[in-house]
Amino acid sequence: DRYVESTRAIMQENAVYPNMLALAERAWLGGGAGYFNAPTAALSPEASAETREAFVDFERRLLWHNDRVFAGEPFPYVAQSHAQWYISPVYPNGGDLTASYLPEEQYLKQMKAHQYTPPAEVGGEAYPYQRTSGGSGVYLRHTWGDICYGLVPNASENSTVYATAWVHSDADTTAGLIFETQNYSRSEADVAPQQGTWDYKGSRLWVNGEAIAPPRWLNAVGQRNIDLPLANENAASRPPLQIQLQKGWNQILIKLPIGRFTLPEIRLNKWMFAAAITTPDGGKALPNLQYAKPSL
């Protein structure tokens, strides 16, 4: 496994305390909503109302322990059960990771016209989305393919998908955004992204039509090196982005192309995203934030 510089880095990168409590919950109570390849997990589109309610209760108790038991300890988890993302159809990109498709074109046109209010329903040409996902972290295709559940069935290489969310803020505010499109495995020697890019897939991010730049990567691009510790490649190990939310509705768009599932720089090229809107310091989910839930 990859060299690490401190015990704290291990706890932070691997979310040890949140995962420990999640494992304890299931080991103590049993139950659950399907095996790990089932599309019925707590925040997936096919989850039952009872499963979702159970997760909301679990999350409440998880965060209670964060505040009272693990204060000051690395605990990379914020509330996400209220989040709602809309996912576009899959667009074959023929290997062109820069190609634009209808969701991007319509979004930029709507943002230029200041059309921030969510529609009553999605699925048409103006809002071409066909599935939803709750939560702030979504695997379109799991690292291990069909062995584990991913949102896009029968995912294939050279594909592009978009994810969008509408969020309502009570006031103009600066918020944090915990964001990543590649979670670097701690058992791999994968190479940091090139400066000015989010990953090796061509992912992009917009908030109200403004393109959001990636951070400056601390590890320089180079050869794969198992003895080089991860720096700020993963969102858990860097400050959140600072984004501006306007009073009223805001729309976020994430472009998620994928080329090959394995690259010279990244052995496990993960088709995924994490996007959690937080307080500016990233410590908690932003209070009083409302996600729109148009019908499909």
List PLM regions with ranges.
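Flexible, acidic glycine-rich loops studded with aromatic residues
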Residues: D1-H82
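Surface-exposed intrinsically disordered loops and tails
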Residues: G34-D57, G123-Y129, G135, Q223-N234, ...
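Accessory carbohydrate-binding/adhesion or oligomerization-edge regions at the termini
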Residues: D57-S156, R186, W217, K255-L296
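Extended extracellular/luminal ectodomain segments enriched in beta-structured repeat modules
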Residues: E157-V161, H168-I178
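Beta-strand elements of well-folded, non-transmembrane domains
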Residues: A165-A171, T181-S185, I258-R260
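Beta-strand-rich ligand-recognition modules
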Residues: D190-A192, G196-F273
